[in-house]
């Protein structure tokens, strides 16, 4: 017997669908009639298993999917504060687990993103898979195919002031759904040796721009001091 025991209440023994294929999606909804009206379905689609009870908290909580006497299948906590995708908090986007086929840890905020459009993609996927040679520059604009798959626009470095302290900041525009890659921050003192600096930056702001684009602004966790060594940064795009 498979059922949700934390967050919402739903027992899959009562599901309209008794089995699904690998990679197939199954939905449980709060109200079938309202779901069909919102998404333009004349009748309830086959991928809707049924309706759940209780509502998820807008401020985050624990979700647990259990088997049998309570053996956890999935057990995690989500939140609505950074570093979790804050654009999913009241702006109409759903939270999307990135590359679920790789079995990512759902407790980690960086394994989630917002849907590329408001209202989400129930029953479907908004993932854009990469095709082609990652190192080629098919349109001859000086950027590799892999970079253009993940990002658009300019990458901007800046200095911002927080409580009278200067901090480094980095802004870039990410294409939502480009889940075949990781986006990382690297820094260097000499432009020869580069180090991963993801842990040295925190998300300051996420701004949905429409058309499946999101502007992400990161801020260094440490202020800039006069005796700091000059630091350079770059964004590294790598395939999963």
Regions found by a protein language model. Name each.
Residues 1-110, 114-129:
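Activation on beta-sandwich/Ig-like modules and their edge loops
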